[in-house]
Amino acid sequence: MNYLVLSNSIRAAVVTWGKSLSVDLAPFGITVNSIITGFIDTEHLAHLNEQKSNNMNIPVSEILEGIKKSIPSNRLGKPSEMGQLATFLASDKASYITGTAIPIDGGFLRSI
């Protein structure tokens, strides 16, 4: 994602750290997973879009449409969708899922 240099830089490190931590904690029945978020409809994203709008001198609505067009599902994610995934991963139903990174991005990521 553009305009998120620091965030983008640490993402890979956090995912790798989570994987290593999951190996160390699995014998104790503790799971560790990462949620890789795409464009989620939050105040933070709105703020970033406003900054980009000011920098590029184009309407926020145009920026938002461009973002949506880049996502195969053609929409932003909802915070509740991210919360539901986190809730599932923290539940007993996900007790055998550990050391993984799960994208919640409407199909935005083009890699595995």
Region locations from a protein language model:
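Active-site loop immediately N-terminal to the catalytic Tyr-X3-Lys motif
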Residues: 1-5, 27-28, 74, 92
